[in-house]
Amino acid sequence: MTFIDKLSAAWQTQNSQLCIGLDPDPAKFPAHLQGKPDAILDFCKAIIDATADAACSFKPQIAYFAALRAEDQLEEICKYLRERYPHIPVVLDAKRGDIGATAEQYAREAFERYGADAVTVNPYMGFDSVQPYLERQDKGVIVLCRTSNAGGSDLQFLDVGGQPLYQHVAHLVADKWNTNGQCALVVGATFPNELAQVRAIVGDMPLLIPGIGAQGGDIKATVEAGRTANGTGMMINSSRAILYAKPDEMFAQAARQVALETRDAINRFCV
């Protein structure tokens, strides 16, 4: 099953367009996990088990693992997701961007080492930096477009042939790079006007939408701008607001409650 097929099925069977980010920060873990050698693995497994029925996808952020020399625990988490929740896509948030030969190694890392269904990539170096990912036709390639951070405007609004750069990227991906129907775009919830413009450009292409929760994006405005005609098409990501809803032994139950509330809030505006 391709990433797009798996995601489309998850939207329906899970009744969810909530993507749950896995950004483990041991400094925010509850006291009973502090100092344990497998704290990251135990924390993430508990979050996954508590929230899986509320999610259309999980998105581990590779930097949170690499900074702690915990890539082996990330491998275990991805394996755990594949084995326990094979119907839920795993998006490796890596935002890689490099020359073709190096990109090939990053693609192997994402899809062979971690077994991810999709990966985020940076398009700044052009097609040959993205091509190795696209060659895995069953995998998803999620391209940065209009990012949720304020500094994204430094580059993404630069004029490119009469349109801002982020719109040029949206056209480029939709018209030229998506020949296998495997692409998606990252567009921030913090910019609903631009989100609506990207949706108009790319049609039914899936959008990974960070920026709700801790970053302050409005769910109603996000859904109204990002949904497709049938009310789907989105992976609306929330990480910190779910992961760290409660800093004690009840952290997983609290995460579940926030995840369910967020999923339901998204669904209210999808009709």
Swiss-Prot record:
Enzyme class name: lyase
What is any Pfam family matched here? OMPdecase
Sorted UniProt keywords: Decarboxylase, Lyase, Pyrimidine biosynthesis
- Which residues of this protein are catalytic? K95
GO BP term, example: 'de novo' UMP biosynthetic process
Stated EC number for the protein is: 4.1.1.23
Which reaction(s) are listed as its catalytic activity? orotidine 5'-phosphate + H(+) = UMP + CO2
**Mind telling me which InterPro entries this protein's record contains?**
Aldolase_TIM, OMPdecase_AS, OMPdecase_type-2, OMPdeCOase_dom, RibuloseP-bd_barrel
Disulfide bond annotation, renumbered to this chain: none
Pathway, per Swiss-Prot/TrEMBL?
Pyrimidine metabolism; UMP biosynthesis via de novo pathway; UMP from orotate: step 2/2
GO molecular function term, any single one: orotidine-5'-phosphate decarboxylase activity
Classification via HAMAP family: OMPdecase_type2
**What family name appears in the similarity comment?**
Belongs to the OMP decarboxylase family. Type 2 subfamily.
Q: What is this protein called?
A: Orotidine 5'-phosphate decarboxylase
